[in-house]
From Swiss-Prot:
Belongs to the UPF0178 family. This is UPF0178 protein Rsph17029_2512. Pfam families: DUF188. It comes from the Bacteria. HAMAP family: UPF0178.
Length: 162
């Protein structure tokens, strides 16, 4: 059975992910260390983990498997869940796979090195746009269909027709 895990701290697409999860009838876990509104739908569960570095990431990484989808911008978390067989969609609609996660990790490390070399560099990433939101919805829809098919294959087809 497919589950949808959301690395919910600072995730701009929680509502969109919930709509897709409900439409597909899959459980969705909003994982954070607090500060998010409890979900209204019974398929959506808030998981509050203790404060600390990467605690939410570890909770997700310990559970995500083949047939699951994870929404995160955290590249190290994405690498862990991709290795476990889960599909990853970033909030901007980019998908991370075994084919591109190595490049994503290398780029992340390079950018961290560049930022540390210039402590006076200001500014962050670009603002989150309607186009990003639209790309996310398209990518999540494709990932959910692919994950549900992978979940059926992994379980020997026992979920067919559900």
């Amino acid at each position: 059975m497919t589950d949808l895990y959301i690395d919910a701290d600072a995730c701009p697409v929680k509502a969109e992910a919930e709509r897709v999860a409900v439409r597909h009838g899959v459980r969705m876990f909003l994982v954070s260390n607090g500060g998010i509104r409890p979900p209204a739908h019974p398929l959506v569960e808030s998981i509050f983990v203790p404060e600390g570095p990467d605690v939410a990431d570890m909770w997700i990484a310990d559970r995500a498997r083949t047939g699951d989808v994870v929404v995160t911008s955290d590249i190290p978390l994405a690498a862990k869940v991709v290795a476990a067989g889960a599909l990853v969609v970033k909030p901007n609609g980019e998908t991370l796979t075994t084919a591109n996660i190595g490049n994503a990790l290398a780029t992340r490390d390079l950018m961290a090195d560049l930022r540390s070399a210039d402590p006076f560099r200001q500014g962050g990433g670009r603002t989150f746009s309607k186009a990003d939101r639209s790309r996310f919805l398209d990518a999540l829809e494709r990932a959910m269909r692919k994950a549900q098919e992978a979940g059926r294959s992994a379980s020997g087809g026992s979920e067919a027709g559900s």
